[in-house]
Amino acid sequence: MSATPTPTLRPSTVADLETHVAHRVAMFQDMEMGTEEGRKRMAESFRHQLRSWLVTGQCRGLVLEENGRSVASVLLLLKETLPTPVTPLSVRGYLFNVYTVPSHRRRRLAARLTDSALDLARELGIEIVELHASLEAEGLYQRMGFVPTSEMRLVMSAGIKTPKQWKHRR
């Protein structure tokens, strides 16, 4: 009986763009958020935005590979924000697109990626990292030290239906 291989961690490059796009689409599909058409439109817009962020270094990514296949990935956006009394720094980390393919779930790969992304944030001097957790991943992030905040959101377009995942969860 052979042991389960341990996926190899490496930094993302622009060559991983389609992996990150596919993982984002799959993530929202898994959460049953949006329609197939809406996810297609999102993918096109995201592809353009992420390419720009990866090229400029505003976004850093990590990929876990096994046998040459990307099985999990994460992105860390360096987000301009306002200084606060908590920290005078005007850049925060925004962790997003944490995704593991279904065949590799329950192996703590999301935790490994998140830990590695937080290490990267520390190396970059980031003092605060934010994220939006799916219901399924909320417990993982709370165990890692993330806390719910007072963030609120207003949908300004009549054409946008508020997803059930945005409902208050505290």
Task: Show where each model-derived region lies.
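A short beta-loop-alpha structural element at the N-terminal edge
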Residues: T8-A22
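A short helix-loop-beta-strand connector motif used in the catalytic cores of GNAT acetyltransferases and
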Residues: H48-V63, Y94
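Conserved acetyl-CoA binding element of GNAT-fold acetyltransferases
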Residues: V86-P102
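Conserved catalytic-core motifs of GNAT/GCN5-like acyltransferases
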Residues: L78-T84, E130-H132, E136, Q142, ...
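Conserved GNAT acetyl-CoA-binding A-motif
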Residues: T114, A121-A133
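Conserved acetyl-CoA pyrophosphate-binding loop and the N-cap/start of the following alpha-helix
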Residues: H104-S116
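Conserved GNAT-fold acetyl-CoA-binding loop/helix
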Residues: F28-Q49
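Conserved beta-strand in the GNAT
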Residues: V63, R69-L78, Y94, Y99
